Amino acid sequence: MIFLITELGNVEFDKNNFKRCKFKDIIFKDCIFNANVFSKCIFENVSFENCRFYKPDNINIFSDECIFMKIIFKNCNLENSVFKECRISDLKFIESTLEHAIFSNVLIENNQISDCDCRGLKIINSTIEKFRFEDKNITKLDEYVFIDTIKLDKKYKKSYEEVARVYKNISKKLEENNLINHASEYYYLSKCIEHKSLTGIDKINSTIYWLLCGYGERPTYALITSLEIIFGFAVLYMFTGLSISGNVVNYVEVFSYNFSERNVVTDFMSCLYFSTVTFTTVGYGDITPLNLSVFLSAIEMFLGLTMTGIWTATLARKITR
């Protein structure tokens, strides 16, 4: 069935089952849609103005490969509406209510949300491309909003870039709604996805940024990296030489002469102690670096100052937010 009426106003659609219908070049004004099911329907160049798709305990369902092309929902109530297995392209939600609406297994292409109420919105197991917010005021989001891991085509670099941009847009909008913890998680996801699209020096820089502090969102990463540096330098000091109370620890020489007389655990703990005080720039002076260890200790002190600053800044940022 094809609907080619140019305009419908003040019409109530109650508990209908629309199957394989095509709605084209139609303007719905002040209409009420109550408990309707749209299956395998096509909506093309259709505008809904001041329409209501919600009554308590009666929701509208769009499912089974419904297609939306060049659609506008303006000042509509789509609360609790369900969009399942649909293709949604060039669709605009303007000053509408999408509270607790569910989008499941949908393909979303080049869609826009402007000044809408999206509290409790769920997007599950879907592919999203070019999804953006264009607000004069602020689209409302809350802690119950859930955007599932977005599907992407791993064969195309552009797919990673688009998904990263979507996550960044969501993060920015959550931050505007003072949902800082949620915003930081979506920002972290955006950076992880963006990392996969990078090459060369940009990818190296991104990897370092991730290892150091999880793109500024993971203070524990800075702590773990610091511990790895301390342990790594402790091992190096065992082979480059330290003077401990007149005794020299240098396992390059030990391997050449008499290994059996050395207490490896005690020597390693001494090197670990020296590495720790060097990294934290405390330095009690009871252990003296020898030969190459002097140069290594200078490097470790610089890394210690840097990592302490990164860890402190990242932790403070998370706490204050």
Language model features with spans:
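Pore domain of cation channels
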Residues: F259-R321
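Tandem repeat scaffolds
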Residues: M1-K168, K173-L174, L179-H182
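Transmembrane alpha-helical segments and their cytosolic interface motifs
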Residues: G200-L242
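Short, membrane-interfacial amphipathic segments enriched in basic
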Residues: Y160, H195-N205, V265
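Extended, hydrophilic extramembrane loops/domains of integral membrane proteins
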Residues: N177-L198
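Outer-pore turret/helix-boundary of cation channels
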Residues: E228-C271
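Alpha-helical transmembrane segments of integral membrane proteins, especially early/N-terminal helices
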Residues: I147-K154, E185-K191, V265-T266
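Short amphipathic alpha-helical coupling elements at transmembrane boundaries
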Residues: E185-Y188, W210, S297
